[in-house]
């Protein structure tokens, strides 16, 4: 009897959490796309323009690293940009989500973690409708194999895990340190430059390379490029590497968030 | 049947002076060896309280005496540092209406959003939309973004959503009537319905005559301590006497 009551309670909590997530995500998306007729596809504009810019500037110089094909450079730059854009959008929106809803948290009892999570979920939705189809078509044209298209899920899943972990971490830190956005901007820039997005990883000096491997996005970009561009079947080792980095970061972020959240209310 | 029980509830919170906190300053103070643990203050001191079903309780006391904090503890927004809180039944908080609104999205979307935030399911809220719009007299504004409403209309909407249900426990923090005169009457009627409908009500108010008239029991908080608890009239008298002494 007691057990069934407990089960019932947790089920109710799960349902409430789900409902909250649902309304918050639809709120986020509605606010973002109200009155813009391109809607979700605005989010594609940024990586497309950036890819064009990089190709115009670096394309000819770096083409030799990409089998003397500018097209390969374009695709490599685009996949990298998609990942880094998703990362920076997710985490910087998650950063302010807890503090931004502070007055609400002071008035209604709500699970705090739903706010950073709703930001990530809104971006996942946007990615799934906007960028993902384009990547899938690219992959299919390159590899002529459905297995590669399906395997795209894994690096993307790893990316979502990394973003959720970092999102939890920064949203919690922001409660304590209100000047965090300035520092975080710098961090994003470092991650952005240290991931081989618009330059080939081969030009990085040997002494510096080990540091670049610390970048949590590197294994994800590598795995995504292998699946999308190489034309060979998905490399499982790369996929596992990406997922592992995702799980580690999510665990880290969630642990910090969980340990600190009892102190949030005094500062909101 | 008791619906709320507080046993020896104490709450320590970080003090207001600590509200300037940033990474730069914290790092500097660590390097200079001046870092100290944030100071904490006792906001509620060993509160014991049992509320039975259907009781109407007025909470009075000076500003900063912990009245709203006590309500937050009961609503589960704050966790007590020591002691235990037990609550049976659904709590409807009626604190500063409109806090959950998003000005960018339409009235109808806000009804769903606010309702779910307050703890109802989306399906439930969808059925209530009509009655809420009707009560708030905003049928013509269904698809207008909330930023297009006047502040009085927003308050009306907040009140209509928060009171469209019959909660087991109603918590009122200084908001009893909003909007123009005709709407105030509607509000009062609805609040009176709650009063009659055997709901448990907790009110924080500085309107002492209101507490005397509408509440059965009174609680007087002073600097986080429960100074007096008893009949509403006695509590108000006690409170006034202490004020006159000063």
Name what the model sees in each region.
Chain B
Residues 25-32, 112, 124-141:
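Conserved ABC ATPase "signature" region
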Residues 214-231, 239:
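H-loop (His-switch) and adjacent beta-strand-loop-beta switch element
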Residues 184-197:
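Helical segment within the ABC ATPase nucleotide-binding domain
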Residues 60-62:
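The feature captures the beta-strand-to-loop junction immediately N-terminal to the Walker
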Residues 205-206:
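H-loop/switch region of ABC-family ATPase nucleotide-binding domains
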Residues 2-43, 233-246:
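Pre-NBD coupling/linker segments of ABC/ABC-like ATPases
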